[in-house]
Amino acid sequence: LPISSFAAEEESSVESAAGYTNVDVPALGEPDGSLKDGGKQLTILCWNDDDLKYMYDIVADATGMDKSMINYKNVGSNGTEANEQYAQVFLSGDDVDLYFCDADWNMAYQNNDEYSAPLSAVGISEDMYANAYGYTVAMGKDKNGVLKGASWQAAAGGYAYRADLAEEYLGVTSPEDMQAQVGSWDDFWKTAATVYEKSGNTTAMADSLGGVWRAYSNGNRTKSWVNDGKLDPSSVGDFISMAKENFDKGYISGATQWNDDWLPQGMSDGAQANKTFGFFFPTWAIAKGGSLEQAEGGEGGSTYGKYALCEGPTSWFWGGTWICVYPKTDNAKEAGQFIYTMTADADAMQKYVDARGDFVNNKGVMSATTEAGTNSNPLFGGQDQFQILFNSADKIDMSIASEYDAKINTDLQNAVQDYCNGVTASEDDCLNAFLDAIAADVTDI
């Protein structure tokens, strides 16, 4: 269920990070003795090591920890699979110290004391996050207000578009001019019509139904899926109508997020060439080695560096990752060191920004990075993505989040996909299919 007092806590933390100077935070404390220590390996579960591989050296340099002690264990190929498989790993009795949780389902793990320990057990306290974006701290608490997870990133989203096609089809030569054409959903779809026509009815404005949903859901939805223990589907009607209309017109690609046909649309060669004009991507997708780099074909690919970034039709976010401590850890000291370094140590977080190009969960670091203007992202032809996303990060509001979001979002996207592909015949049928799926998948609401 939605975190109690979450909305009030989130509201109190809203402030502009522009010109923000970090306040001093306490040093990492000692473990409280409730968890085991002295183990040989610090085992970390995640669905990939895209972020982790940049953390090893940073943690080792900051703490003196031998980085060979850190053991990454892959669980699943994406966040959804990890959500389903973590519990099985826990039951197996395998070594686990830390694990990464996605925003869609971190509450389910943090609300289970058998799966997550208070961060205080490893020497971490809430006042260490005085410089963090407030929503990340609120999302790291369980239903009783106990801090169970910490995040190193703030995951604001934007619209990554083909700058070469924008100039060819729209005469647009800057992100500012592009934003003027996509600054609302009405403007976005109006521009989509022009792109589709100028491309000979081959190029969709949006990369997928899932991409549009992520931006709409986390930018325009104002109610939690679950209120007073009951499902509230009132937010979906407008989206279903918008999705169907623009899918039928060819303005939304038929590709599915994370499937093999999704990212190749971003290239100018191959079977999927030029199938989409742009992607709805958050910070982590446009960092080094992320989804955008794959969509460009990698360094030397057909569209490498040919993208640009604007805010798009709404301020939105997608995901974010929280680090949690497994209660059966045997490395309480190292677990605390790892989390503190990557989520509270400003110097270490600055190194991560420089190495990974991700947007970290520290207002002072991101304010200084943005004001310096030295960040240059080769995926965007040298554009500084932080200049676009900086203000959006302040607007992230997760007060409507619930622990059921992963299943509900998946069921909705499946229902809308079926409706757009003709499996279901009407909007009412689509909504009913969604509600039936929820009834089967989420039995306690």
Residue ranges: model-predicted function:
Residues 52-56, 60, 106, 212, ...:
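Extracytoplasmic/periplasmic substrate-binding proteins
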Residues 116, 287, 316-317, 321-406:
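Mature extracytoplasmic/periplasmic domains
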Residues 120-127, 138-211, 223-257, 327-333, ...:
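Helix-loop-helix "hinge/cap" segment bordering the ligand-binding cleft or interdomain interface
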